């Protein structure tokens, strides 16, 4: 047993005899893995099967042995390997974990017989059903969609499977199951997808599978003092009805679903009594009736509340009361676009008045640290849009500072400035990373202008806020974000580069050059409206 588990609650330990061993990989560190609700949910669903013993693997740190957390067994002892992937920057980690476990990283190199030593690799998670192709070479099977409706049918089929070549039957009969080896791609001279060929009997398009309703909201199954978030999490629903044009989650989790108050309270009621901090996922969907139910539960159980961010136009008196009683010290609001015009372009639907009113209401409720999240590099963005954001921040300060002073408190603003990355399945999937006009983007074959354009915008905002008291600005590095933009819309040709990066054999730039891949092709090149995408 890993030392980290001595302080963990919710660990599942099963005897191996008579059970099918399943490894569950999370391609990042333990603190992030144990904070990921999707990873925890999959761990519970797999171990809920009487036929399965599931143990977790996380990305190894400091050259520690690559063994399962529960029993310290090597990956080669598991005939079935699941991977839960959420973020593009973890793709290379996944490839490295397979190699560290002694598993041939490419599915094509694994023996036909499925057994310990030559396991079947199944990948899923939001990163996979957004765009499975960057990881297609590493997977025998991929799950396109949410786990709950797929696993009851998939797990018995996998348990009975002995030959990798029989996977096509699962792909043909099980909704949401994608067998990458059964699909081949042809590209034109410009590197764009020209044609997708499919093996006989398989669907031309594997449609995403979604959970229709839930009697119990997904919640933390495992708690650890080493978790990144350090709270008990409960999901209020999935998806979002707002339709912001940049947001992948708002499109790939369609239709938006808000769980019933009974389902949410059932999830909250699983909280260990000694845990008094609750995190809610999906606050932007919560209606007044649900908030009332949650508020009653939290007050009765003396719990405090936390969440990732709030919509500025959904801050009700009941929510403010709940926040005030929770002793929350900071709240994040996401304008996303720098100006009201840009927020219209991205379909955010927030006015300047909404944002100022939200800031005032939050400070009035005793929350003196406000975080504002904004993107640069959005389509049609100009310096005027940046200047309007500077003015917005100044107006917010003018409104909230006197309120804080009357209460003897300093108000603090934290600005998070991030480079916009176009995502699959969104209306912005056709756009260029870097925010350049189409003609300039077509000429920017080394991506230098895209990165410089973003750096220029970030520098403008940093300079504007450099001498402002009680204001902190956090920015990303566009040259580093470029790799995320590449992986986001990449196809399976990126696989060898991911393997080299994961094994530490090359930097991102070196790997792209070695394998004759173009960052411009994936990240900066504008797409045509009639283009065929690999994720389709």
Q: What are the roles of these predicted feature ranges?
A:
Residues 59-197, 423-491, 500-502, 506:
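Glycine-rich beta-alpha loop elements in corrinoid/cobalamin-binding modules
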């Amino acid at each position: 047993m890993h030392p980290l588990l001595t302080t963990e609650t919710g660990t599942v330990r099963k005897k191996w005899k008579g059970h099918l061993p399943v490894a569950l990989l999370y391609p990042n560190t333990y603190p992030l893995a144990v904070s990921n609700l999707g990873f925890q949910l999959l761990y519970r669903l797999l171990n809920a099967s009487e036929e399965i013993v599931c143990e977790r693997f996380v990305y190894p740190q400091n050259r520690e042995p690559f063994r399962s957390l529960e029993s310290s067994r090597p990956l080669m002892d598991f005939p079935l390997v699941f991977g839960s992937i959420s973020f593009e920057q973890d793709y290379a980690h996944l490839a490295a974990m397979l190699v560290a476990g002694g598993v041939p990283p490419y599915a094509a190199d694994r023996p036909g017989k499925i057994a310990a030593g030559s396991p079947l690799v199944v990948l899923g998670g939001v990163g996979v059903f957004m765009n499975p192709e960057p990881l297609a070479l590493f997977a025998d099977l991929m799950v396109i969609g949410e786990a709950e409706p797929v696993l009851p049918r998939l797990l018995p089929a996998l348990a009975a499977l002995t030959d990798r070549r029989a996977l096509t039957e699962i792909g043909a009969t099980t909704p949401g199951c994608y067998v990458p080896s059964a699909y081949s791609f042809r590209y034109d001279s410009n590197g764009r997808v020209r044609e997708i060929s499919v093996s006989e009997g398989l669907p031309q398009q594997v449609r995403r599978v979604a959970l229709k309703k839930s009697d119990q909201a997904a919640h933390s199954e495992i708690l650890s003092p080493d978790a990144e978030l350090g709270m008990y999490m409960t999901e209020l629903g999935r998806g979002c009805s707002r339709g912001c044009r940049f947001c992948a989650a708002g499109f790939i989790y369609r239709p938006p679903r808000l769980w019933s108050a009974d389902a949410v309270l059932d999830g909250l009621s699983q909280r260990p009594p000694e845990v008094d901090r609750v995190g809610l996922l999906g606050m932007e969907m919560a209606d007044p009736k649900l908030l009332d139910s949650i508020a009653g539960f939290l007050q009765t159980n003396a719990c405090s509340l936390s969440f990732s961010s709030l919509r500025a136009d959904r801050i009700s008196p009941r929510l403010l009361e709940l926040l005030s009683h929770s002793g929350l010290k900071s709240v994040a609001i996401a304008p996303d676009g720098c100006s009201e015009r840009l927020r219209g372009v991205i379909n955010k639907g927030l006015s300047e008045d909404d944002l100022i009113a939200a800031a005032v209401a939050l400070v009035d409720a005793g929350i003196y640290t406000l975080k504002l999240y904004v993107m640069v590099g959005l389509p049609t963005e100009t310096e005027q849009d940046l200047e309007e954001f500077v003015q917005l921040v100044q107006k917010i300060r003018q409104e909230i500072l006197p309120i804080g002073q009357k209460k003897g408190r300093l108000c603090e603003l934290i600005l998070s400035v991030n480079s916009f990355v176009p995502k699959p399945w969104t209306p912005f999937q056709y756009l260029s990373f870097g925010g350049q006009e189409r003609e300039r983007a077509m000429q920017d074959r080394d991506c230098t202008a895209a990165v410089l354009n973003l750096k220029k915008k970030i520098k403008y905002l940093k300079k504007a806020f450099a001498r402002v008291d009680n204001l902190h600005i956090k920015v990303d590095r566009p040259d580093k974000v470029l790799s995320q933009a590449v992986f986001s819309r990449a196809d399976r040709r990126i696989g060898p580069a991911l393997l080299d990066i994961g094994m530490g054999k090359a930097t991102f730039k070196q790997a792209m050059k070695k394998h004759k891949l173009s960052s411009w092709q994936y990240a900066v090149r504008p797409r045509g409206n009639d283009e065929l995408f690999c994720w389709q």
